[in-house]
From Swiss-Prot:
Outcome when changing S175D: No significant change in DNA-binding activity
The keyword Metal-binding appears for this protein: no
Location of the Myb-like domain: 79-143
SMART domains (alphabetical): SANT (SM00717)
Outcome, altering T278A: No significant change in DNA-binding activity
Pfam families the record matches: Myb_DNA-bind_4
Record-given protein name: Trihelix transcription factor GT-1
Amino acid sequence: MFISDKSRPTDFYKDDHHNSSTTSTTRDMMIDVLTTTNESVDLQSHHHHNHHNHHLHQSQPQQQILLGESSGEDHEVKAPKKRAETWVQDETRSLIMFRRGMDGLFNTSKSNKHLWEQISSKMREKGFDRSPTMCTDKWRNLLKEFKKAKHHDRGNGSAKMSYYKEIEDILRERSKKVTPPQYNKSPNTPPTSAKVDSFMQFTDKGFDDTSISFGSVEANGRPALNLERRLDHDGHPLAITTAVDAVAANGVTPWNWRETPGNGDDSHGQPFGGRVITVKFGDYTRRIGVDGSAEAIKEVIRSAFGLRTRRAFWLEDEDQIIRCLDRDMPLGNYLLRLDDGLAIRVCHYDESNQLPVHSEEKIFYTEEDYREFLARQGWSSLQVDGFRNIENMDDLQPGAVYRGVR
């Protein structure tokens, strides 16, 4: 007797009075199938002895599958799809609020992983169970949406993006802190728009913030994109950054400032088409435009790093080459070096008996500083060794002891 290798599906809905043609009706039914590691179970034998093993089946782990009667073909067991979690408005607004409140910290930290963990913790306190990575990815997506809305809708993105205004406010606040007026070169570009653009940046490689490419940069501590740090820098992802969250127009990430920057010629996705270098001083990193004159570049650097004295400074590249400040300087990463000045010790004497009263250490950075010091003391020069008068700063010897001469 020949028995088919394939077991036919049993129609539990079929009446005894129905004609056999009803078997062609397409229905779906749910049946329980034993979950077992033995793939060689004889399905036909199982069919004949099903009623003997009914109680055993109930005690075993089971899984439900959906079978159709429309054909005699074997049916696949398909795992149910997991619905992607969506962010409700309250969650998104809370994320933006927390990110905005910590924006200043993103500008000074090389790794933002701990900052996203704090944001995640605050989200949980408000009843939103979102991990640091989920928060990072959502933030990057918001930045990407903002950039798309801004540049494709000519700045009128608020109509198509729910949180356009909130993101724009964060970027505007950042630009006010670090962007000097000289950056606005084009008369056709609104000041606010120019400032915001200078901090927007996308990265094709992905931000580990996820993006920025919008990747997971911030969440895992690696550079990702940054509206954060350069609109949070990864070349192209949005990262908002003052030092900056951020990946800049040349693709430099503030968190990983040694990353090779772009050449400035890539016009795809780059909100700022000028020449930009990345300058690092201590724990701070700034992206500086070098399209102006040498004097303008110096003033921008002084303003960006808060240099309020007249001490000299220079930029040194990764090959320890000191570069001239001009619009033709090579694009790349630079270290900001400050002049240590000239330190000497000055003794003050009692004019009546010529005995030393006290001494002080003075540091001069410019000839003008030296002249002002002499004028305040009422001296014409400084004297060393009791006979040599020094009238010019260049003749001073570091560490030497001097006295004033009227």
